[in-house]
Amino acid sequence: MKLTPEQQAMLNGEKGETMAKVVKTLVMYGDAFGAERMVPVTSKYGHTVISFGLKAIKPVYELYDQLIDAGLTSAQKFTADPRPIDDNIPTSLLEDIVFKKIMYTHQASYEEQLKKLGIKGEDDYSCTCYMDEVGNKPAKGEVLSWAESSAVVYANSVLGARCNRNSGIIELMGSVAGFVPEFGLLTDEGRKATWIIEVKCEKKPEAQLLGSAIGMKVMEEVPYIKGLDKWLGTELTDGVCAYLKDFGAATASNGSVGLYHIENLTPEAKEHGEALIKEGAQVYVIDDAELERVKASYPIIWKNKDAKPELCFVGCPHMSVQQLKDWTDAIEEKLRANGLSKVTVPTVFTAAPAVIKALKGTVYLDKLATYVLPSRRPSGLR
């Protein structure tokens, strides 16, 4: 690892022992992946994946206290993943005891730590920090220090930013130091595709199912996807971005994809085309039958396979304003067609606080509260 004089001075302790430990951690991280140098974090905001005050992660709180005591707030403001608890969602006494008295006993104190470290705002908790309403949308080519896998793959693929699939804590250290080791998806070579995906479906593939199929096949490698522009077009409209949000999250969670290219659609694919494909790339053909095979491969994990669902959650990653409107319209249509006034399974739609605020003053927020969930407060959202 070749450090700049300033970085070497930080490692030597000129900015304090705690900062030296931060830099040493980043150096060790880079060494593990063959990085030769550090590069500056250039995005306006960071993002942290750890947003939950679990009792079991005491070492995290101790580490963050060391940063705070040393005056090492983040060099950039940051957003965070969703809070684990929302009072809008009805819970039983037992659930309240488990969630608030046993599991998330450090939530309030942890959020105080995040404030001291530099969280962007009181309600900036969302896995879709890149949405316009949340305001953490990096530009093409910017270097990030993020860990949330669905946000990383979206930023890399749809926005053209550059970010590795970092771990929690490491991502905050990159924001504190202001630089990260250069390897993998931060490099031109690391962003080239080693898989060609040929989509040959007769109907628009379901985003989550297509993403799952690709993720399980390519794992952590980079796919170049052909044929999907037939269904999505060549422009990144709000609807297309919502599709890619869900698609990318599935590639990242069912595999470990941090970047994908879609021919004629995503920015780097538009700019470079098939020059992004490495020689000897493997080919995976996906048709309707293949998607059905993948869907059928998922096991039913309920102990009682005939049990009636008690609660449904929709929105991981968090939903967009347009998705919430579309779901509301679809539910309203189906309820009317079936002579019902409310869905038979209580349902929670999850979205960023800023997205929910954007729905206020429209008919959609009240409709969702009426149709989907008997909540404590007038909202079927969290």
Residue ranges of each PLM-predicted region?
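Non-transmembrane, aqueous-exposed alpha-helical and coiled segments at domain scale
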Residues: 1-382
